[in-house]
Amino acid sequence: MVTNVGEQLKKQPVLRGGGFTFKQFFVAHDRCAMKVGTDGVLLGAWVPVLHARRVLDIGCGSGLIALMIAQRSLPQVQIDGVELEPAAAQQASSNVELSPWAERIHIHQQDIHQFAENHPHQYDLIVSNPPYFAPAIACRDEARDTARYTGSLTHDALLNCAEKLITEDGMFCVVLPHELGIEFARLAGQQGWFVRCQVDIRDRPGKPLHRMLLTLSRQAGETVYQHLALRQSEGVYSPEFCQLISDFYLNY
């Protein structure tokens, strides 16, 4: 007899519309400007959670990454998600309430600058799938602008907020388009951050690099460089990507 809610969902996932069904939870995203996508899944599956005790997701959107980290981390780990856009924050809260980890995840509908100034806790793991489009050409949808464009949260401001909120030996992890990841790492270095891990990502062998996963720290140390192809040459998911997503995607 299955008594654990997470295990029950894993064995019998409920397929629903308006979102994305994972093995142990469902993410509704019909009220969010940015939908569940590969970038968020990559970050949530990859970030180092082994030594984390308190986690912050900046710009948490639907709550996807916070939920993935909750599934991967120890039961005592507490997770805060900060989201500026009201509809997304409300949907993230609903997703959390329906998940097996409702007591561990707390969603704050707030500007991250105010949160960084007033929040009493520091975090040993901070994650973000940040905006990356320049604000020269805006969307017609204000919520989508907030999610996609750096006008609401520049990368410089993001790094400053993370510095205020991170513990002395904490890790700050982001996912970005590859060229912007290079620029983000350069900017971080100017502000006293050190790159501790960099994963260069391409869709398949021989294709251009298109995404980057970065782990930053305020402490100097060895930098680990890795590569990941999401698919093999014939188009099927690569074994490395399957290993990352196997605890989350159905049929893997």
UniProtKB/Swiss-Prot annotation:
GO terms for cellular component: cytoplasm. It catalyses: adenosine(37) in tRNA1(Val) + S-adenosyl-L-methionine = N(6)-methyladenosine(37) in tRNA1(Val) + S-adenosyl-L-homocysteine + H(+). Its main location: cytoplasm. It comes from the Bacteria. The keyword S-adenosyl-L-methionine applies. Its EC number is 2.1.1.223. Keywords: Cytoplasm, Methyltransferase, S-adenosyl-L-methionine, Transferase, tRNA processing. It holds the Pfam family MTS. It is found in: Cytoplasm. The keyword Methyltransferase applies. GO terms for molecular function: nucleic acid binding; tRNA (adenine-N6)-methyltransferase activity. Belongs to the methyltransferase superfamily. tRNA (adenine-N(6)-)-methyltransferase family. Specifically methylates the adenine in position 37 of tRNA(1)(Val) (anticodon cmo5UAC). HAMAP family: tRNA_methyltr_YfiC. This is tRNA1(Val) (adenine(37)-N6)-methyltransferase.
